[in-house]
Amino acid sequence: NILNSDLTFGIGPAGTGKTYLAIAVGVSLYINNLVDKIILSRPAVEAGERLGFLPGDMKDKVDPYMQPLYESLQDCLPGRQISKMLDEKIIEIAPLAFMRGRTLSNAFVVLDEAQNTTKMQMKMFLTRLGENSKMVITGDTSQIDLPKGIESGLVSAIRILKNVKGINFSIFNSEDVVRHHMVTKIIKAYEVFDK
């Protein structure tokens, strides 16, 4: 589905491979000279923490937070090649806040953990899409870490964009989990409890 659409949403529970699949497609498109760069981003909200409260400079704050993106890259490319591509700005990993004002052309763009965007952040990110680019938005609407009363940008995007031609929505469920078999059981238990 990613290959057939310029904008794809991958929505589902933890462990379904949403981020890995998106990054693997991006790496494949780059290797086949179909995009010039890979841009990976996440909102700076995670389980109640914000970057400003973490110790160190911006790189110290951002790198651990972006670790899941690095891990998915490491499943697709050798470490030395990742380092070289990062140095040459072929791969860019940056917080969502750094995307404002940009046009992302000739790129494969991934927004991970999109359930933690606000409606305005999501709109801002989606409107960065430039010519000859593909964008994948991944998230889990059951793991929203935003303050109470703030609607998730992912939830609002699903509602607003569900009927827009050319936008693809791929929905995963607990049956799609590829992590440890206990993850499926945990997700199902929470689904039952939350009903």
Predicted regions and their residues:
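Conserved helicase motor core of SF1/SF2 NTP-dependent helicases
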Residues: 1-111, 115-195
